[in-house]
């Protein structure tokens, strides 16, 4: 199998390539049926989280160009399905024929592993626990920050309206919830009751939870609802520097949560379609230098240290924590905080 790790990848990029299909199919809608590979015409479906669409829109043609240069006569197209991370995982579990999944928390892929759709030990199949890049949670506020929001505790003040994705269905929303909770624990010396009091106040200031991260962005930026959007750093930069200019500002909290974006091949699908090698190559290429450069240019923290060093100015130094170190593994996190009747539900009921 061809290896695309940065140290081993040497193939030159060619100018001729087939365009990637960039169809966005939200969770709950039927994506186009993928035909089985005949060795010459290959179609992959990538089921991904909501705000990853901008990265994969540019990544797919990059991969196609490279793969086709190494496999003359082969035509590759990539289809995309985007939505809340957990909704996407459920769609795959319920039959969405995705060759690969690219999520923003490991529990969503663990669900597929438990159902026998993804190989056991999937995090060891690729470098960096199968997460080619990371992000963190920040605040996006309106120009000049009229509510003077500087840190998580400011979100609990009266008169502040917050927009986030739904923590029950979206990794984006879960990281927002856990970021606030982790800040509460740190600033109260681990006092659970006080941390929950802070988070309950923040939830009280959140009138509605959007289905996914991009839906939350749309509500905040286009519908002009809310004073602050809690979202991934890359999404906040996309809005403030690429989508609009001069309308929004990014606020980095004093203590925030880091977020890995793990990926995996859906074995049950690729075995049926005969797309194993291409699907594997598609994920391996995420660690190539061109893909890592692309990630950094879109404000995703690359794993390649040389690429990260070149983009150091784009990533402020942050005091951050991982959800695993603060709250235990994702199995425990999901059961304790986001299962029906869990801490999130109990705190939301206080709204």
Where are the language model's segments positioned?
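Sec-dependent signal peptide recognition
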Residues: 2-9
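Short beta-strand->loop
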Residues: 47-49, 141-143, 161-188, 202-206, ...
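Short helix-loop capping/hinge motifs at secondary-structure junctions, enriched
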Residues: 144-150, 169, 182-190, 269-277
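Ligand-binding pocket segment of bilobal, Venus flytrap-like solute-binding proteins
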Residues: 187-254
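Extracellular/periplasmic juxtamembrane helices and adjacent flexible linkers that interface
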Residues: 270-351
